[in-house]
UniProtKB/Swiss-Prot annotation:
Pathway: Purine metabolism; IMP biosynthesis via de novo pathway; 5-amino-1-(5-phospho-D-ribosyl)imidazole from N(2)-formyl-N(1)-(5-phospho-D-ribosyl)glycinamide: step 2/2. The keyword Nucleotidyltransferase does not apply. This is Phosphoribosylformylglycinamidine cyclo-ligase. It catalyses: 2-formamido-N(1)-(5-O-phospho-beta-D-ribosyl)acetamidine + ATP = 5-amino-1-(5-phospho-beta-D-ribosyl)imidazole + ADP + phosphate + H(+). The gene is purM.
Amino acid sequence: MSEVYKQAGVDVEKGYEAVERLKKHVARTHRPEVLGGIGAFAGAFDLSSLQYKEPVLLSGTDGVGTKLKLAIDLDKHDTVGIDLVAMCVNDIIAQGGDPLFFLDYIACGENDPSRIEAIVSGIAEGCEQAGAALIGGETAEMPGMYDPDEYDLAGFVVGIVEKSAMITGKDIKSGDVVIGLSSSGIHSNGYSLVRKLIADVDLNQTYPGLSQTVKDAVMAPTKIYAKSIQALKKEVNLKGISHITGGGFDENIPRMLPDGLGVLIETNSWDIPEVFHFLEEKGNIDNREMYGVFNMGIGMAVVVAEEDVSIALQLLEKVDEQAYVIGKVTEEEGVHFTL
């Protein structure tokens, strides 16, 4: 390939090497509906065998935010791909979608094949957890736009749902019950604040109140809830689902509620992961404010009728999903807490 292009900072040979390294990871995510392989101009997915009567496609796109800055600083790239898939997939399953396929975009200052492979191995792991095929992607080497060690990620997912089975929240009423599904930690939101709070901390050390290193606590990959929600949908009428992301409870719970309704959250009904206590103390943050920034141990909330609570909890236990009854729907708008 052109030596002139290489002198400009774009090493095409390294790009070819990266593609070869990725093939085995992409293969792990294969579904029979995928047509073709790596190298085509477009990824192709055959919907005809899925046998939906009124199929609705759901799409979502997202990134990992400034959690990537920590990954770069720590030279830990194998789990941010899971975060990327989770942030996209958890959004579409909140409306009842089943993930079909995923695409990624990696922009970097320098194409390091081993680093790209680590990132994509995480993306493939996330796709496996979600049941989505990784059918395409782009790695853009952009010298001058990014420093050699810098990169950014974006993901895009497409899912499907029967039109009549879309989860919109329209049937939620006062007295319905909110069930919280446990998070794996901070997930991928609030990291500009997290990085500020731990700026003077040795990330390889443990601290009072933390049973793991700060690095392990803040880099825990985001949980993907696809299989848990799929298990629930088969037997329970899920009235609403909220993915607790940026803005915590305050921003995300109302997104699933009809106008005129709110929720009362019982904050003593689940075990709050120790990393949140650590951050709260480190920054001297008001406890109530924490719920407006972080997930506080609840990564997804679902609303069911009171008579469905028992079966919902049983189904979640069968798929090893830790869940709690965390509150009720009320006629007072907004999100309220018993702190």
